[in-house]
């Protein structure tokens, strides 16, 4: 905790500082807006960013010297020891979505950070961190406040209420209301007194160090921020869900002001001007406000020309004071060094056998990408550029010209700040460095080393980010800490990236992916993994990457039907749900397995496959081709990190897929397993159109779903997500999770059961039926056929048929049924299984009608299928029964079928082909191939 205070007489600068989370409606990481900590030296009329252009920032803490600054950020904790002129990124991969940061009373180097994954503590100026009291009794923490009179005494505001520690985090005690805490302050007059603002039960106060609490009446239910006027401690002000509340009598009586605030102006930050107490600043969901009459009336702040400043900025914190302007303290200028493991793992990779024709298929993909770049380059409009990764093929095939080089130079004049920029940049450099002009080499080095990049907030984001960071550190190890955008050494950056990649691999191989089996995002996993396989200097990391590529491809191959990734998916877009040809995993099937034509949608990142040395073993291609008999394939995946509303960080996901030569029926268990883009079940078949798929869904949306996975204020999340995922609230959307949906599937029969409360957004369920299905309707049964596949769907309740506009998607109809308690019963057949369609239809109609019983506890559904098997689902207790006996998913098996076998939490996965079995042991990085006895 020891530190050296600055020498007396150092220069200072009077400043007003705000933290900008992002601009409403913008995509995080977009280069057109500056976010993060901003500084004004003219009382808020003009602003400049203090750190990098793009850094999500929730809070700022400044020490009494104005020298040590800490910012709570999405990427961790930013720290500065020279008044905010130079910064260092801290926390590593274990720290993410930090919501609050505070300096302890002992020293400016003692720092507390509260975030979506708990509480962190540092005694060295944020360079290293611990999680005090781990495992902690809380997860999502929004606020932290160390007692200025006793550094061991700390209050922590979590999503489930207030916690207090008296021993610096060794133990914790729950106190106060069991409601989300949004603000904590300590009274300036008496260190025994505290106030908290809550989301749902207003303002509370304690007069005994936080042990006992009493609600303060008159503030409203949502208090985002509470502040005390330093010059008049009885003057309190609260930021509300709209506008402010203020009291001049220590909280006995309150007034509310919304005058000048927009309807969207939830107030998150408040600050009394230090020189004029009549002036108050407010940071809101939609910008920066000021009051010149003690908070009674407000207006958006403007510059000297009357232009509104920081318009639409989401501002979470404000600070005012004198910033240190003594000597700058940059990171070390010493040349960086890097130590990389050189010890190879034991054993061989066994990659000598792979599907014939690979080189021919790779050449077809290269030609496609070359032609794509040629056409793009010839038709560029102002502001447009060639795709950087597509240009790799253009360059390597000897087609580069001055127009291309000029376009690449122009791209990097306004390069973005997300992992969708850093990853393509390192791919481009490593695959073309032997062809690049020297100035472009330097442009890329400078951008990758010194240009700030946002890590993102999803699994694929982090894999791209850390792959780019590791390969950049490896490529330019001599870069000094002062050159690195993180402010840290090359070795520190490399070690952080390697640490997360290893941890992600461990989790993926033991409890499954979070963004699992997504045709849309498959490329964002394969491309980084293949880059690591190709360019990692660490032979153990190279082996690990190859094994992960094997696992991802085998996972896809087991559920691939003619190149279409079947079953339930974590993330899909509407067009990808219904357009089988628009499947970004299909080109991988084409390249590595063969057997299908080159598909319509080829992502340029496939370049990492065609120019790389990775080869998919024949044993995996065997899985993709072998469809001579039906089989059940089950998997355990995981829900992505749950920040709120879940006892488990990663609840399990259960996948069940029934594969046949003609169709695949696949499902997840239902419920919220992935926000926004979940695709819970469908049947996909080989037929006469692109959209040969049928499924149902409840088009659910709610801040509850979003707040489970995203750290922002739940009240702002729906609008924020809607601005970026425009279909989220659409009642006609084609993908959605829902807490009111459950699935029970046994082979070719499926029950989709719904229990939708009256107050829920969108009171209906949708059945999607493609136009290619030739169907009839009888006694609530929809029975149809296409190709060799027969489909029967029973619906409870009357609905409305809606035709899909042909110009938007391939022809289809949707059956829209008012919900409440309802269900669909689905049976799938085929010519080889059931004979003629007429025979199948008669078998279905001869069965007793499905039964649905509604109760206060939810529906119960019972159905006996054409095979004589009885399926029951009971909402109360989430009970599934097969032929009268309770049925459960094989929850202990990560993969289970004739093609893949792995138990949960073992890290050992067997892949079984026609003639060999391939064992991937992620614990030892050993690969074993053994012959499979012939049948």
Task: Map each language-model feature to its residues.
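A short loop-to-beta-strand structural motif that recurs across blades of beta-propeller domains
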Residues: 35-39, 76-79, 118-121, 161-164, ...
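Extended amphipathic alpha-helical segments with heptad-repeat/coiled-coil character used for oligomerization
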Residues: 543-605
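Short coil-to-beta transitions that initiate beta-strands within beta-rich domains
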Residues: 51-61, 91-104, 133-147, 176-187, ...
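Short coil/turn segments that connect the beta-strands within blades of beta-propeller domains
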Residues: 13-14, 20, 67, 108-109, ...
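Trp- and S/T/G-rich repeat-edge/linker motifs of beta-rich repeat architectures
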Residues: 3, 33, 42-55, 85-94, ...
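Conserved Ser/Thr-centered positions that define the repeating blades of beta-propeller domains
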Residues: 40-41, 63, 80-81, 122-123, ...
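Ser/Thr/Asn(+Pro)-rich, low-complexity disordered segments
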Residues: 344-464, 477, 490-501, 594-935
């Amino acid at each position: 905790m020891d530190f050296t205070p600055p020498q007396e007489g150092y220069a200072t600068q009077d400043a007003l500082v705000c933290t900008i989370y992002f601009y409403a409606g913008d995509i995080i990481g977009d280069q057109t807006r500056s976010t993060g900590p901003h500084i004004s030296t003219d009382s808020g009329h003009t602003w400049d960013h203090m750190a990098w252009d793009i850094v999500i920032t929730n809070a700022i803490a400044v020490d009494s010297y104005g020298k040590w600054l800490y910012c709570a950020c999405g990427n961790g904790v930013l720290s500065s020891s020279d008044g905010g002129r130079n910064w260092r990124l801290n926390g590593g991969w274990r720290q993410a979505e930090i919501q609050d940061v505070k300096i302890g009373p002992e020293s400016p180097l003692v720092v507390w950070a509260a975030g979506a994954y708990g509480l962190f503590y540092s005694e060295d100026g944020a360079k290293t961190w611990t999680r005090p009291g781990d495992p902690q009794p809380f997860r999502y923490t929004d606020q932290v406040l160390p007692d200025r009179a006793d550094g061991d005494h700390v209050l922590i505001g979590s999503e489930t209420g207030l916690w207090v520690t008296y021993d610096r985090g060794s133990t914790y005690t729950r106190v106060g209301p069991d409601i989300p805490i949004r603000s904590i302050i300590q009274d300036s007059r008496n260190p025994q007194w505290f106030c908290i603002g809550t989301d749902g039960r207003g303002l509370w106060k304690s007069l005994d160090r936080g042990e006992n609490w009493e609600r303060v009446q008159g503030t409203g239910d949502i208090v985002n921020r509470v502040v005390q006027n330093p010059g008049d401690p009885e003057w309190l002000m609260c930021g509300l869900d709209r506008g402010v509340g203020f009291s001049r009598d220590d909280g006995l009586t309150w007034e509310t002001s919304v005058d000048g605030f927009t309807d969207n102006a939830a107030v998150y930050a408040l600050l009394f001007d230090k020189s004029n107490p009549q002036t108050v600043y407010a940071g809101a969901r939609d910008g920066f406000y000021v009051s010149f009459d003690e908070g009674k009336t407000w207006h958006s702040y403007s510059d000297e020309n009357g232009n509104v400043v920081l318009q639409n900025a989401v501002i979470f914190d404000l600070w005012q004071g004198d910033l240190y302007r003594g000597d700058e303290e940059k990171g070390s200028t010493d040349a960086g060094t890097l130590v990389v493991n050189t010890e190879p793992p034991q054993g061989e990779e066994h990659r000598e056998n792979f599907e014939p024709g690979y080189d021919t298929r790779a050449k077809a993909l290269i030609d496609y990408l070359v032609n794509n770049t040629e056409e793009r380059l010839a038709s560029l409009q102002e502001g447009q550029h060639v795709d950087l990764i597509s240009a790799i093929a253009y360059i390597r095939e000897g087609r580069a010209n001055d127009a291309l080089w000029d376009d690449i130079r122009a791209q990097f004049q306004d390069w973005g700040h997300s992992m969708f920029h850093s990853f393509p940049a390192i791919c481009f450099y490593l695959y073309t460095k032997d062809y690049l002009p020297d100035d472009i080499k330097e442009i890329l080095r400078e951008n990758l080393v010194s240009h700030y990049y946002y890590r993102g907030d999803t699994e694929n984001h982090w894999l791209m980010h850390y792959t780019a960071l590791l390969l950049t550190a490896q490529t330019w190890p001599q870069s000094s800490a002062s050159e690195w955008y993180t402010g840290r050494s090359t070795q520190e950056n490399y070690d952080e990236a390697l640490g997360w990649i290893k941890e992600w691999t461990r989790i993926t191989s033991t409890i499954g992916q979070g963004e699992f089996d997504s045709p849309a995002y498959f490329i964002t996993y394969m491309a980084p993994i293949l880059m690591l396989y190709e360019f990692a200097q660490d032979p153990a990391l190279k082996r690990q990457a190859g094994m992960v590529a094997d696992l991802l491809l085998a996972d896809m191959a087991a559920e691939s039907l003619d190149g279409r990734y079947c079953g339930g998916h974590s993330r899909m877009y509407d067009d990808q749900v219904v357009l089988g040809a628009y499947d970004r995993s299909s080109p991988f099937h084409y390249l590595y397995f063969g057997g299908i034509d080159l598909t319509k949608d080829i992502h340029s990142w496939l370049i990492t496959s065609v120019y790389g040395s990775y080869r998919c073993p024949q044993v995996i291609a065997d899985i993709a081709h072998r469809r001579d008999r039906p089989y059940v394939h089950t998997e355990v995946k995981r829900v992505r990190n749950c920040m709120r509303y879940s006892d488990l960080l990663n609840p399990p996901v259960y996948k069940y897929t029934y594969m046949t030569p003609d169709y695949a029926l696949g499902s997840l268990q239902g419920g919220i397993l992935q926000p926004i883009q979940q695709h819970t079940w469908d049947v996909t078949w080989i037929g006469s159109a692109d959209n040969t798929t049928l499924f149902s869904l409840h088009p659910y949306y709610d801040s509850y779903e979003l707040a489970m996975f995203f750290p922002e204020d739940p009240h702002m999340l729906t609008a924020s997500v809607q601005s970026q995922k425009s279909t989220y609230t659409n009642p006609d959307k084609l993908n959605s999770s829902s807490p009111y949906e459950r699935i029970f599937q046994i082979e070719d029969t499926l029950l989709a059961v719904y229990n939708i409360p009256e107050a829920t957004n969108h009171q209906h369920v949708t059945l999607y039926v493609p136009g290619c299905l030739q169907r009839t309707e009888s006694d609530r049964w929809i029975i149809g056929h296409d190709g060799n596949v027969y489909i029967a769907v029973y619906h409870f309740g009357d609905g409305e048929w809606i035709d899909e506009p042909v110009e938007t998607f391939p022809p289809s109809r949707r059956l829209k049924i008012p919900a409440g308690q309802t269900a669909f019963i689905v049976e799938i057949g085929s010519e080889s299984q059931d004979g003629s369609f007429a025979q199948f239809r008669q078998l279905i109609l001869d069965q007793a009608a499905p039964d649905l019983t509604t109760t206060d506890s939810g529906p119960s559904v019972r159905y006996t299928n054409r095979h004589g098997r009885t399926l029951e689902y009971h909402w109360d207790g989430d009970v599934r029964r097969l032929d009268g006996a309770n049925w459960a998913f094989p929850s202990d098996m990560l993969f289970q079928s004739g093609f893949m076998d792995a138990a949960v939490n073992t890290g050992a996965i067997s892949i079984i082909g026609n003639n060999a079995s391939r064992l991937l042991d992620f614990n030892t990085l050993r690969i074993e191939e053994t012959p499979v006895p012939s049948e």
